[in-house]
Amino acid sequence: MSAIIVRNLSQVMNGLTAYDQQIMNAAEYAIGQAGFALEREAKKNANTGTHKRGEGHIPGTGPGPNVVTGTLRRSITTEVRYGFGSYIATVGPTVEYARAVELGNPKWRGKRYPYLIPAAGTLIGNGTLSRVFNNAFAQRMR
C-alpha cells in the first residue's frame, strides 16, 4: 500500500486558490477580447459607404448600410460581465433603429442590412473568434 502525505496543505490550498483567480482573470480578459473582435467586425460591416441625409443607399457599396451620421456604428459596444458562474460578453448596438437595420421591419421604409449576425458568422467560421480567445487566455496565464 502507498500513501501520499501532504504536510503543507495550507500552502497547497493557497497556491490552488491563486491559480483559480488567475484562471478567472484570464477568462474575463479572453471573453472581453473575443467580444471586442466581434464589435470591430460588426462596425466594419455597418460601414459600407457614406452619403448625406436623404440621398438613399449608394449602389455598389456592398451589402451593408451606408453611413449618414455614424450613430449606428458608434452605438455598437461590448460589455463584459460575470453572471451565473460564467463571463458573458454582450455585443450590440444601443440605437433604437438598429434592430430594423439588422433584421428589417415592415414599418421601416429602409432595406434590411445585416451587420451583426454576419460578423459573428464570419469570425466563428474562419476561426478568428477561437484564436482571439485562446491567445488572450494564454497571454494572461503566463
Where are these regions (language model features)?
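Short, Lys/Arg-rich flexible segments
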Residues: 1-142
